[in-house]
Amino acid sequence: MPVVWDDVTRAEVLRAIQEYDRLGPEKFFSEHGFAPTTTYDLVWDERRYPPKAILGTAYEFATGQRLASGDFEGGKTGAVKVLGKLGFTVRPRQPAR
């Protein structure tokens, strides 16, 4: 069954970003059950975040239900699209320099 994103607002996404900043990547991924991004970056306040992990965590904050990474798509038709509708910028991932 597809995930319905109606309950997720900008506020939950920003809360997930704050959680990521507070915990750091490794602990965030461990606690929320996601992995680093490979294709896209959510760009906020000149920093880059893993869009699928941030959106999944925002969903958990909004609904109290935890999603697994396999429960929804992360690419253009998934997390990227949902985050864009909420007014966030998601860009193709740049190689590390």
Segments and roles (model prediction):
Residues 1-97:
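Intrinsically disordered, charged low-complexity linkers and terminal tails
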